[in-house]
Amino acid sequence: MTEMQLLEMLKKEASSVHIKDIMSASVYLREDARYLPPREQKEFIERFTRAFFNRIRDIKNDKNIYQGHVDTAGLKEFIDFLDQQLSQAKTENERCFQKIARIITIYVTFVRKEPVHPVGTRFPGGFTVRREGNVFYCPVKDRQINTPGALCRFCVSIQDHDIS
């Protein structure tokens, strides 16, 4: 499968995402973030809601020409992982979140070759995902790589070794 074929499939999926779905995903984020400090909670919800809206729009409008082929074994493993997460969703809001996250993470990982969390994403302690040239650095990858439910093992970023 080519990256362009995958992009076309993702565009079709993205066209089925409506503002109501993004709002439902936002409600799930609010529920999921309830244990964060209030300031971080607000930033977390706003950042992810904005990212969902922007990324779905980006997918729908992506006119780039991608020349590569998709790692189909990696994609299958990734989809199996996402299917497992979706099957464990407890609410309709969580299912909306999983549906949107699935489209976006497949797009950024297998078409764009970018990290799951966009450059600039802030983690506790103020550390951020950053880019130098074509390399993406994550401040928490090594600590989160084995966390159940985390997408870190599929992410193209590497651990930021400037962070201890």
From Swiss-Prot:
InterPro entries documented for this protein: DUF2115
Protein name: UPF0305 protein MTH_812
One of the Pfam families matching this protein, by short name: DUF2115
Recorded family membership: Belongs to the UPF0305 family.
Disulfide bonding pattern of the chain: none
